[in-house]
Amino acid sequence: MKDTLFYKFIARPFVWFWFSLLYGCKVVGKENIPKNGRVVLAGNHTNNWDSLMLISVVPRQVHFLAKDALFKGFPGFFLRRVGGIPVNRKIHDKDALINAKKTLEMDLCIGIFPEGTINRTDDIIMPFKIGAVKMSHDTDSTIVPFIITGEYKLFRRNTRVEFFPGYKIKSDDLTKENEKLMKKISKELKKNK
């Protein structure tokens, strides 16, 4: 399935222009994102703008999992049109996981922040929930780790996103695989501090 017309011709160009003009973003490792097939982009969550910033730099449509509270009014309209998947974070939202897996089974790309929320702690990273690894494993998708560094400050141009080589989750020990993903992202964040 190709990018939706709304995404390709309206949402992505608008978001790209807005982010390029106001924030700028250095992108490293874009070649590590497969152009086709099932992909789970998994990385740290620093700010409310992270999803939109990734929409502006990833060369294919990204279907983000986002808290259901964001799916109201105009933001909700926009999120639905760009393929957003609402998640009720108060419960173990099986419907969100089912929708995300269906999206991957159509050979599309999912974006997820395994921390589950914006990291407002002093820790470099918060513990990961297992959803990204489980979805990747269950759908035989390539998981592509990424990090976001810098701050979204107007006209500062210090935001950076780096994508690392993707891999398939072959082991059934998902707890161990989740720790491996978390350690990889944590290690890269420490290098970039």
PLM features: residue spans?
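Membrane-anchoring hydrophobic helices of lipid-metabolizing enzymes
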Residues: 1-40, 75, 83-84, 98, ...
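Catalytic core of membrane glycerolipid acyltransferases/transacylases, capturing the structured
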Residues: 11, 35-91
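A generic structural signal for alpha->beta connector loops
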Residues: 22-24, 61, 81, 107, ...
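A generic local structural motif
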Residues: 25-30, 49-51, 71, 97-98, ...
